[in-house]
UniProtKB/Swiss-Prot annotation:
<dbReference type="GO" id="GO:0044205">
    <property type="term" value="P:'de novo' UMP biosynthetic process"/>
</dbReference>
<dbReference type="InterPro" id="IPR013785">
    <property type="entry name" value="Aldolase_TIM"/>
</dbReference>
<dbReference type="GO" id="GO:0004590">
    <property type="term" value="F:orotidine-5'-phosphate decarboxylase activity"/>
</dbReference>
<dbReference type="InterPro" id="IPR001754">
    <property type="entry name" value="OMPdeCOase_dom"/>
</dbReference>
<dbReference type="InterPro" id="IPR011995">
    <property type="entry name" value="OMPdecase_type-2"/>
</dbReference>
<comment type="similarity">
    <text>Belongs to the OMP decarboxylase family. Type 2 subfamily.</text>
</comment>
<feature type="active site" description="Proton donor">
    <location>
        <position position="96"/>
    </location>
</feature>
<keyword id="KW-0210">Decarboxylase</keyword>
<dbReference type="GO" id="GO:0006207">
    <property type="term" value="P:'de novo' pyrimidine nucleobase biosynthetic process"/>
</dbReference>
<protein>
    <recommendedName>
        <fullName>Orotidine 5'-phosphate decarboxylase</fullName>
        <ecNumber>4.1.1.23</ecNumber>
    </recommendedName>
</protein>
<dbReference type="InterPro" id="IPR011060">
    <property type="entry name" value="RibuloseP-bd_barrel"/>
</dbReference>
<keyword id="KW-0456">Lyase</keyword>
<keyword id="KW-0665">Pyrimidine biosynthesis</keyword>
<comment type="pathway">
    <text>Pyrimidine metabolism; UMP biosynthesis via de novo pathway; UMP from orotate: step 2/2.</text>
</comment>
<dbReference type="Pfam" id="PF00215">
    <property type="entry name" value="OMPdecase"/>
</dbReference>
């Protein structure tokens, strides 16, 4: 199962997930010169991937940064996912799909097959749990996985997710129902191919959330630029075995801190990953 592969990568490499949220603004002009958007976005991503792949569990590609540039951007998105697959690296397509019925079926096909194939995708359950229906057959095949939004890292998460529902925050109602579904898709590592997105910026109830869902892998955004603290993140990881911690700008823009950064983008991305690992693992 793909969750077993991810679990193994965490144990062998680290809990770090590199976010390839690659804005065109992040790419130095010297790389852009004379190239199409599809070419320079992929070139930038490849530099990051090549210099960090042995240190990290996986890579998360946020589709919005590519969709914004039409066909050219989506070519870069496709090529990035293909490069990850060709190098036996685990990919998460951050697409946050949240529709139902035949539309969800087409979304599942779009992101688990063909040009945009990824190992995991992110899913939004706001419309109801039938949003998951057409992704589950891909989990049954043991080759794909999903991370479903449970409690997110953005400040506005409290507008809805923290609302009282039967005496507890609404996010527990979401998590409890997802947990029932997730138990049908356990790997040998005793974790499910249905994971949760749990923001690291909110330390409230961290221990309770981790204990309540022992068979769930957490995708944890918020580290770095968003300010999640390592001591809070460690709780969600459960001895560094049940979570991956995403950092995007903190890694891919680290080169901007150095005078020779534009000539050494990959080198400084690697340094950011090394520093992140030391920070979280207390090395």
């Amino acid at each position: 199962m793909i969750i077993d592969k991810l679990s193994k990568r965490i144990n062998e490499r680290s809990i770090v997930c590199v976010g390839l949220d690659t804005s065109t603004d992040y790419v130095p002009e010297k790389i852009k010169k004379g190239k199409k958007v599809s070419e320079y976005l992929f070139e930038f991503n490849k530099e990051i991937i090549d210099n960090t792949k042995d240190l990290v569990a996986c890579f998360k590609v946020q589709i919005a940064y590519y969709e914004a540039h039409g066909i050219e951007g989506l070519i870069a998105y496709k090529n990035t996912l293909k490069y990850l697959k060709d190098n036996d690296l685990i990919s998460i397509a951050d697409v946050k799909r949240g529709d139902i019925a035949n539309t969800a079926k087409e979304y599942a096909k779009a992101h688990f097959e063909g040009d945009f194939e990824a190992d995991f995708i992110t899913v939004n359950p706001f419309m109801g749990y039938d949003t998951l229906e057409h992704y589950l057959p891909y989990l049954e095949s043991k080759e794909k996985g999903i991370f479903v939004l449970m409690r997110t890292s953005n400040p506005g998460s409290k507008d809805i997710q923290y609302k009282d529902y039967k005496g507890q925050p609404l996010y527990y109602e979401i998590g409890d129902n997802l947990n029932k579904i997730a138990k049908d898709y356990l790997g040998e590592c005793n974790l499910s191919c249905l994971g949760f997105v749990v923001g690291g910026t909110q330390s409230e109830n961290a221990n309770k959330i981790r204990e309540r869902y022992p068979n769930i892998m957490f995708l944890i955004p918020g580290y770095g630029a968003q300010g999640a603290k390592p001591e809070d993140i460690r709780v969600y990881l459960d001895n560094f075995k049940k979570g991956i911690v995403n950092s995007s700008r903190g890694i891919i823009l680290n080169y901007r801190k150095f005078d020779d950064g534009e000539e050494n983008i990959g080198k400084y991305a690697r340094k950011a990953v090394e520093d992140m690992r030391k920070d979280i693992y207390c090395e």
